Amino acid sequence: MDLRTLWDQHRAAAWPKFSSSSEGELMTLDTVISGCATYYFDERSLDAPRLLMLGHCLDDLDMLLPDVPEETGEYFTRLRTLAGLLLDAARTT
């Protein structure tokens, strides 16, 4: 799946309903990654601070994903895939 299609799917998805001690952190990661995606599609690139921030988001998601409730797995796995594709695309531009 290409980056644009995945981004469109993610934007159309509703925030999952769940209760977790990580919910606030996951919401922040979703917001930051979405902001990077918006910037990338507007500018066709990411600057160095955003690349660094996106890398940290991926690290944080990798730590949190094993503990997200099963019913939210699709949403956050898609977010993780989106961040990885975005980072790869930005590094090649």
Regions found by a protein language model. Give the residues of each.
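Amphipathic alpha-helical interaction modules
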Residues: 11-59
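Generic structural concept
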Residues: 30, 55-58, 62, 77-80, ...
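Secondary-structure edge/capping motif, primarily at the C-terminal ends of alpha-helices
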Residues: 39-44, 61-68, 90-93
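Short helix-onset patch at the extreme N-terminus, typifying the N->h transition
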Residues: 7-9
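Amphipathic alpha-helical binding modules
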Residues: 68-93
